[in-house]
């Protein structure tokens, strides 16, 4: 019985951590060279939108379609008690962002990026490309 309890506890803790600290796979080159296509990054849902600042990287629902996108905050405005963010990709020629659709409501935000985990092969390949 104790083994079953421990297994259930592990599953519950893992599910909680995965919900609060989601692992996100970067798709596309809009955040290159900061984040590479296919790279895994860690987000957090434990943050205050009022504490977000210029330079923070966030994940949000695009205001133009159902895609979830990762971008860097460039400007912040408060209108009628709601925060709006102007978010840009780090690679402008490959980024569909606030330059195309304007400010994004904080209501669209999914999480804040807190860390990245790079595959060692990607790091080595990146260094070779830059040499």
Predicted regions and their residues:
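Extended hydrophobic leader/signal-anchor segments used for secretion and membrane insertion
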Residues: 1-131
């Amino acid at each position: 019985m104790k083994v079953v309890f421990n297994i259930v506890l592990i599953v519950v803790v893992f599910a909680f951590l995965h919900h609060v600290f989601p692992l996100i796979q970067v798709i596309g080159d809009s955040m290159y060279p900061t984040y590479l296509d296919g790279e895994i990054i860690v987000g957090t849902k434990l943050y205050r939108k009022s504490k977000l600042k210029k330079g923070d990287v966030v994940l949000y629902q695009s205001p133009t379609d159902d895609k979830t996108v990762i971008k860097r905050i460039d400007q912040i405005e408060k209108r009628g008690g709601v925060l709006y963010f102007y978010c840009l990709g780090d690679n402008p020629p490959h980024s569909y962002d606030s330059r195309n659709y304007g400010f994004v409501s904080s209501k669209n935000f999914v999480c804040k990026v807190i860390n990245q985990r790079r595959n060692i092969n990607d790091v080595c390949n990146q260094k070779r490309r830059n040499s």
